[in-house]
Regions:
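Flexible loop/turn segments at secondary-structure boundaries
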Residues: 106, 132-134, 165-168, 190-192, ...
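Beta-sheet entry/capping signal
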Residues: 156-157, 179-181, 219-220, 243-245, ...
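Substrate-binding clefts and catalytic carboxylate motifs of secreted carbohydrate-active enzymes
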Residues: 272-447, 455-458
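Secreted/periplasmic carbohydrate-active enzymes, especially glycoside hydrolases
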Residues: 1-161, 166, 368, 372-378, ...
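Active-site-adjacent substrate/metal-binding segments within catalytic domains
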Residues: 89-220, 317-356, 431
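Active-site region of glycoside hydrolase catalytic domains
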Residues: 92, 206-314
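Alpha-helical structural signal in soluble globular domains
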Residues: 83-85, 170, 174-180, 211, ...
């Protein structure tokens, strides 16, 4: 990918009562690329003006600066300026940024799961689901904070869940700059019916696609979440933007149904038994995740002290979607595995550890099974979900007040682009490389300490790891038979 042929189109409107002759001109700033056309418009006419590389060879661009997702390269952007002039005077102008990249997908995988490619290279999707703020109380400050956390976590794709909205221009601008891919759904979900006014829906769809299609971060169109498309939606989307892939709903065409959604014993992720629906660490999973208890400060924002401790199940369940995530039962039992708590302060601290360990385990299990390196082919995971739309006891990487939980930092660790990890089922150490570059003569080291900080095991190994590769089961950690029940593992790469 060292050359590109760009096509530029712009709608020009003549709102006057007479015919107008005008010049439509464009410039890719900083690249010495200019092009223009003289046209005539009838009164009230709207026309799409297209500049093709065949007609304007200067739109054949050499020495490309490609746009890449997070960890894959730099998300380079270009700027396009367009003007329309009448009798030598600029009547209107616009400015937009765009990126040069190619995003495709297919089902040429062992299990026919959907595989994405960026600029011709396979990309393992380590993504997440985005739920809009519960009352749509958006601000640029909140949007920036949430996307900054999203990038910090290391995920590379954000799914705009079908029960949500199409986010702001500023949201997509930040995704462009941060290298975050976006999977856009269009306001239909399995627990709602089709719109009463389909013409209005399609008009809104057209407006949204036109608004978002210049953003290089926009990667994929999906009509709905677990539902069917509105008749005519696919044809309209493809007419407006044939450069991106499309599927009817979130669980078809190589994307299977999701789960799990609740906390489980972390070992179940390694065993691939975390979902009651069967194997879900395989193929492309659009919804796989678990909640995390928010910080104590946030819990005190959610409910009165008398309901916090001892846990008032009725109140906790109300702030858990009717008890959907089992925070007052299953999550409580997992916290109690670290000892019965005597106060909400103690419970909240242990609750952070439970959520963090589950999040880290989920990501590391998917790292292990990345593409064709693991026990089964995995092309992508979308975590369910990572932001927090309302005050609730089932927080995610951060809570509604934008206070991070331990899950953010454990996810950040698991998704670092060059990462050493431990399999608690096999006692094996592996290394995952998410860069499109190789690393030679790196040392992976494992140290084990008992509860008294005494080192009881140490081993290191030199490795060469190729681009986007996983080296699984490099060596086993042999734990001494007399090790303290609580012990610590430290992994390092250097």
């Amino acid at each position: 990918y060292d050359k590109a042929e760009e096509t530029v189109s712009v709608e020009v409107i003549n709102p006057t009562t007479g015919s107008v002759k005008c010049v439509v001109a464009g410039e890719i700033t900083g690249e010495n690329i200019r092009f223009s056309k003289e046209i005539s418009l009838f009164c009230g006419e709207t026309r799409e003006i297209v500049f093709t590389p065949e007609e304007f060879p200067q739109l054949k661009i050499d020495n490309l600066r490609l746009w890449w997702p997070l960890f894959k390269g730099k998300p380079d952007l270009y700027e396009l300026k367009m003007t329309v002039s009448v009798k030598g005077q600029v009547s209107d102008s616009l400015k937009t940024r765009f990126g040069i990249r190619e995003i495709t997908s297919d089902q040429n995988t062992p299990d026919k799961s959907r595989q994405f490619y960026v600029n011709g290279k396979k990309i393992f999707i380590r993504g997440t689901n985005w739920i809009p703020e519960g009352m749509l109380r958006h601000s640029d400050e909140r949007t920036y904070a949430e996307l900054r956390y999203t990038k910090q976590s290391g995920v590379n794709l954000v799914r705009m869940w079908g029960g949500g909205i199409a986010e702001s221009d500023y949201f997509f601008q930040l995704c462009d700059e941060m290298g975050l891919l976006v999977w856009q759904e269009f306001w239909l979900t399995g627990d709602t019916k089709h719109p009463h006014d389909q013409a209005l829906y399609l008009a809104n769809l057209e407006s949204t696609v036109k608004r978002l299609r210049n953003h290089p971060s926009l990667a994929y169109y999906v009509s709905s979440n677990e539902s069917t498309e509105v008749v005519g939606a696919k044809d309209l989307i493809m007419k407006l933007d044939g450069t991106r892939g499309y599927q009817m709903q979130s669980e078809c065409d190589g994307v299977h149904d999701g789960s799990p959604y609740k906390q489980v014993n972390p070992m179940q992720h390694y065993e691939n038994t975390a979902s009651p629906r069967g194997s879900r660490v395989d193929g492309f999973n659009p919804e796989y995740g678990a909640p995390t208890l928010p910080t104590l400060e946030t819990l005190r924002e959610v409910m009165d002290e008398k309901d916090l401790w001892p846990i008032n199940k009725e109140v906790w369940d109300y702030h858990d979607g009717g008890g959907f995530h089992l925070m007052s039962t299953m999550y409580k039992d997992l916290v109690n595995n670290y000892g019965t708590s005597q106060s909400i302060e103690e419970f909240a601290k242990k609750g952070q550890l439970v959520g963090a360990m589950n999040s880290k385990t989920i990501w590391e299990v998917w790292n292990y099974n990345k593409l064709d390196y693991g026990d089964r082919y995995c092309s992508g995971l979308l975590f369910w979900y990572h932001n927090c739309p309302v005050r609730q006891v089932c927080a995610r990487m951060w809570d509604w007040s934008l206070e991070p939980t331990a899950s953010l930092y454990h996810t950040q660790n698991a998704l670092e682009p060059l990462h050493a990890q431990f399999d608690y089922l096999k006692n094996m150490v592996s290394v995952c490389n998410d860069y499109y570059r190789s690393f030679k003569n790196y040392k992976v080291k494992a140290d084990v300490y008992d509860l008294n900080s005494k080192k009881v095991f140490s081993y290191s190994q030199r490795i060469d790891i190729g681009e986007d590769e996983v080296l699984n089961d490099l060596f086993k950690i042999d734990f001494p038979s007399d090790i303290t029940p609580v012990h610590f593992i430290r992994l390092g790469l250097s």
